[in-house]
From Swiss-Prot:
Gene: araD
Domain of life: Bacteria
GO BP term (any one): L-arabinose catabolic process to xylulose 5-phosphate
Protein induction: Transcription is repressed by glucose and by the binding of AraR to the operon promoter. L-arabinose acts as an inducer by inhibiting the binding of AraR to the DNA, thus allowing expression of the gene.
GO MF entries: aldehyde-lyase activity; L-ribulose-phosphate 4-epimerase activity; zinc ion binding
Pathway recorded for this protein: Carbohydrate degradation; L-arabinose degradation via L-ribulose; D-xylulose 5-phosphate from L-arabinose (bacterial route): step 3/3
Protein family: Belongs to the aldolase class II family. AraD/FucA subfamily.
UniProt: substrate binding residues: 27-28, 44-45, 73-74
Protein name from the UniProt record: L-ribulose-5-phosphate 4-epimerase
Length: 229
């Protein structure tokens, strides 16, 4: 069942270590088959070096396990909520990558300071508000998804494929699991670039709007011309 999706999600999870986005087991990737209404996600606490396609857990859109003998990621309710809230995404990544998490712990958006950021995100990468005690105590992971969706009332999730959860870390998404990994790598890279830019020039300002839009829309949208497609 869902063998192709399992292979993709396995490959994406293994890329977390390849791209140095995780320490120990501090991250997870999922993918969704919209037609079959099934989600495939990493099991909780399993080392990446031990992970196989057979270890991955298959869920329905209520977050219930329909295949697999292991417990799904503890972040499963967040993934499930985001798949419902963002109907055009096909994969989700959560990590505690150091640079993006530093911004999340500071409670700050990552400002768009250059064209690397502009190539992938059409605005600042937002940081969510702090969660209320009641949201943390009851249904914490579900409420994490809700606070992300709340943040994207003011952003286009397809044009800003990532977010910083306040005091926690980044979530990224994409057209599929591997594309979500790509966006997570970019987010980590621009998080580091932004930090160093601010350290070098405390008065640095966001990229010129015209330049930002030029770089974003030459790669995205109906008139994109970057690449070979």
């Amino acid at each position: 069942m869902l063998e192709t999706l399992k292979k993709e999600v396995l490959a994406a999870n293994l890329k977390l270590q390849e791209h140095q986005l995780v320490t120990f087991t501090w991250g997870n990737v999922s993918g969704i088959d919209r037609e079959k209404e099934r989600i495939v996600i990493k099991p909780s606490g399993v080392e990446y070096s031990d992970l196989t396609a057979d270890d991955l857990v298959v869920l329905n859109l209520d977050g219930e396990v329909v295949e697999g003998s292991l417990k799904p990621s503890s972040d499963t309710p967040t993934h499930v909520y985001l798949y419902k809230a963002f109907p055009n995404i096909g994969g989700i990544v959560h990590t505690h990558s150091q640079w993006a998490t530093s911004w999340a712990q500071s409670g700050r958006d990552i400002p768009p300071l250059g064209t690397t950021h502009a190539d992938y995100f059409d605005s600042a990468i937002p940081c969510t508000r702090e969660m209320y005690d009641e949201e943390i105590i009851h249904d914490y992971e579900l409420n994490t998804g809700k606070v992300i969706a709340e943040t994207f009332q003011h952003h286009n999730y397809e044009q800003v494929p990532g977010v910083l959860v306040n005091n926690h870390g980044p979530f990224c998404w994409g057209t599929d699991a591997l594309n979500a990994i790509h966006n997570a790598v970019v987010l980590e890279t621009v998080a580091e670039m932004a930090y160093h830019s601010i350290m070098l020039n405390k008065d640095v300002t966001p990229i010129n709007t015209v330049l930002h839009e030029k770089h974003f829309y030459r790669k995205h949208g109906a008139n994109a011309y970057y690449g070979q497609s």
